[in-house]
Amino acid sequence: MNLHEYQAKELLKSYGLPIQEGLIAYSGDEAAAAFDKTPTDIAVIKAQVHAGGRGKAGGVKLVKTREEAKQVTDELIGTNLVTYQTDAAGQPVNFVLVAEDMYPVQTELYLGAVVDRSSRRVTFMASTEGGVEIEKVAEETPEKIFKVSIDPLVGLLPFQAREVAFKLGLEGKQISQFVKLMTGAYQAFVENDIDLLEINPLAVRENGEIVCVDGKISIDSNALYRLPKIAALQDKSQENERELKAAEFDLNYVALEGNIGCMVNGAGLAMATMDIIKLYGGKPANFLDVGGGATKDRVVEAFKIILEDSSVEGVLINIFGGIVRCDMIAEAIIAAIKEVDVKVPVVVRLEGNNAELGAKILEESGLKLISAQGLSDAAQKIVDAVKA
């Protein structure tokens, strides 16, 4: 689950991190009032959406008067902001953050933390190249990114934070400031089940103070049951409606931009299915894992969710029967097709537990389903059917 910038900053502030202060505004009038309370002559209007690249997309603007703050806010609210991290539809702007102006600054730094699955540890990343996409830095100048892995038994140690501070070129009182900041960031990361934390830029102001100008936090959704205060921060308007509906039925669904819907059991098989669709010239419209213990009701709902996507021109159902029986899947497919007005070709590949029985049930159903033998055959048939 992603947090908005203002939510991420407030969380970091509660752990002692210095942040760029600001107020939320849901209208132009509220933005004008917030501008009056800003301690600086210039304010920054920031569209609050779950996506990076807002500045280049026109979602971050400087304003010098309350009238300008009102105008910019009215122009942003109610629109969809399209950035390099969103799809073509963009993300809805429902409110803005009216923040104090932190510039000019001495330098912009980057500080981030992730769960490194290879080392199974929290890993911090820091760079002197703040204010730009870290992906670009990693690609063009990877030597400018410093990494430090944290031993979960002892946590972040002061010497590790000091080492990062030295590499970032900090000096004097800035060293102790950074150690406190990084220690607080680590504490926030662990205590709130964060899986991604980014402070970009982390600015060194002209007075030498270090401050978090922006903040991005992603929470492990599997941990929300024990984080009620964090869960209450969820903004469903920023999430795909089909993904939200899928979550209600314990379905792992991720919307993509293709035209071939996929229903698969098992994350690995789902990834392989999308890969082979791409290999044969198609474009998957989604990732959907119905799970190893899929029930008939869940399969029916999965089919409905796939077909709710207007861009879907065909569906590939790829099931390997292990825990889940292929005959049950077949019955669920029939029930779903009868319940939903299916106007697109459907290719079905069943293997494993009761696969022959499942195939027989589908064949005797009288429905216009395309049977496939093997993964390659299934991919070729759905791509051909969509192109026909």
UniProtKB/Swiss-Prot annotation:
Top-rank EC class of the record's enzyme: ligase
Residues holding Mg(2+): 200, 214
Family designation: Belongs to the succinate/malate CoA ligase beta subunit family.
Binding-site residues, ATP: 46, 53-55, 100, 103, 108
Listed EC numbers: 6.2.1.5
Co-factor(s): Mg(2+)
Entry-linked Pfam families: ATP-grasp_2, Ligase_CoA
Domain of life: Bacteria
GO molecular function: ATP binding; magnesium ion binding; succinate-CoA ligase (ADP-forming) activity; succinate-CoA ligase (GDP-forming) activity
Cellular component aspect of the GO annotation: cytosol; succinate-CoA ligase complex
Database matches in InterPro entries: ATP-grasp, ATP-grasp_succ-CoA_synth-type, ATP_grasp_subdomain_1, Succ-CoA_synthase_bsu_CS, SUCC_ACL_C, Succ_CoA_ligase-like_bsu, Succinyl-CoA_synth-like
Cofactor note text: Binds 1 Mg(2+) ion per subunit.
Keyword Ligase: yes
Name of the featured protein: Succinate--CoA ligase [ADP-forming] subunit beta
One GO biological process term: tricarboxylic acid cycle
Chain ranges of the ATP-grasp domain: 9-245
Residues noted as binding substrate in the record, renumbered to the chain: 265, 322-324
